[in-house]
Structures are given as C-alpha cells and as structure tokens.
Design a protein with these regions (language model features):
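Extracellular lectin-like interaction modules
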Residues: 1-251
Length: 251
C-alpha cells in the first residue's frame, strides 16, 4: 500500500502498528495526543507540524523519522521522548520536555536545532547537517537530572554555532567542529567533561570561531581546543582535567 496522510489530529491515543515496509505515515498538520504509540515495523514517520504529547513517547519504527519541516515547528513531550528507530532521524525545529528525559541516537539537521528540558536528562548521539549553516542550542536546567550528553557534532560541516547548557554536567563523547561561516562559535555553560579524547575545532579558512567553556571536570582524557585566531575563554574557577592534557591553539 502507499503512504498514509493525516491532517490536523487531536486524539487521546494514536497507535501506529504496521504498513508495507518503506511506506510513509505522514502527519501534515498539528498533532495533540495523550499517547503516541509506535511499533518496531518498517514504516517511516513524518510529523510536519507542531506536536504535543502528554505521556512518554518511544519512537521504535525501523524506518526513518522526520520531526518538523520548518524551524518554527515545536515538539513538546511532556512525559519525555526516546528514539529507538532503525533509520535516519531528521529534526527541523525544537524539542521540548518538562522535567523529563530526551534521548535520541544520531540525528541529522534540516534546520536549526533547539532541545530544551526543564530538568530532565538530555542524551543525543552524533549531530550532523547536510546543508546550510545550522545553529544548535541544547539546554537542561532546573530539576534534579539536568545533565547533557552528546556525541560528535559537525563532522561533515554545516554547523555554525553550538551552545550547550547543563545545570549539573555536560559530557562530550565526540569532537565538535564548526564551519567557515561568520559568527561560528562553541559555548559550554555549566560544568563539562569529556568521555573520550576530544577536539573542539573552530579554526576555519576565513572565519575562526570563539570557544567559551565555563568549567571543566576531570575525566583523565585529553582535550584539544583549536580556535585559530579567535579567542578561547576558560571562565570558571574550576578547570580540572585529572591526568588528561589540555592543548590550546588560539588567541
């Protein structure tokens, strides 16, 4: 069978069971639901408007997942969200949760990305963008589980600014690389640690970017900061790499 297209939806529970493999289930309007239930089947999900879900959502379809098609699209998961899909995940817009967990694997950006939890832990794998010059803002503050963990960011280019704020701890599990666009920068607010040897690289052909880190907690891994001719600011009182080393190249 072909794609399933759904217009504006307001429902207690939306359950997606199965389609023929590689077919699309497309929500072209806004979605409001208490529960949104998916199955581990080979269909693709497209949510092309704003969406609000009262309960926790787990995306477990084995096809692709597309959340949004414009920067203004907002997805509010009041019970948190977990992404366990088997295909490509593309986010265009904002992900919001009220004091609940936000968990994604690797994601691709079609627009700028904003991820905010009012106190819940945020975990994201690698973040890439195939076009444009995208801005990333990730914030978990308030509450008691206000941590952020992210994989590599910008390895394929097209990432302009990265701003991460955590109330407790941000863990970097991969390198961060910004593109050669004016205004590119990396800003880490709160305490940061690195789960592996990490390089933050804003050194570009004609537009070097500033690196700002508020505080660092020892992980015994090495940290390399390369900003070309732009400033590196280590502003916090606490900057402890344990037995790891810090290498800086910049002003």
């Amino acid at each position: 069978s072909g794609s399933v297209n759904v217009s504006d939806t307001n429902s207690g529970t939306i359950t997606l069971t199965d389609t023929t493999n590689n077919q699309n289930i497309i929500f072209n309007g806004n979605v409001t639901a208490d529960s949104f239930v998916t199955a581990a089947q080979g269909y693709d999900i497209f949510l092309n408007g704003n969406a609000t879900f009262a309960n926790a959502v787990t995306f477990q379809n084995t096809g692709t997942l597309d959340l949004g098609n414009t920067t203004s699209d907002t997805f509010t998961f009041n019970g948190g969200v977990t992404e366990n899909t088997g295909g490509t995940v593309t986010i265009d817009g904002a992900i919001v949760s009220s004091n609940d967990v936000i968990s994604f694997g690797n994601i691709n950006l079609g627009q700028n990305l904003s991820v905010t939890s009012a106190g819940g832990a945020i975990s994201i794998g690698t973040i890439t963008a195939t076009s444009g010059s995208r801005d990333i803002s990730i914030t978990s503050s308030g509450g008691s589980a206000n941590t952020v963990a992210v994989g590599a960011i910008g390895g394929s280019g097209n990432i302009n600014t990265v701003a991460i704020t955590s109330g407790t701890l941000t863990t970097l599990n991969g390198n961060i690389t910004t593109d050669n666009s004016s205004g590119n920068s990396v800003t880490l607010v709160g305490t940061t640690t690195n789960g592996a040897n990490i390089t933050i690289d804003t050194d570009n052909t004609s537009n070097d970017g500033a690196i700002n880190i508020a505080a660092f907690s020892g992980s015994n891994n090495n940290l390399v900061l390369n900003s070309g001719t732009a400033e590196i600011t280590l502003s916090g009182a606490a900057f402890n790499l344990g037995s790891g080393s810090l290498t800086t190249t910049g002003d």
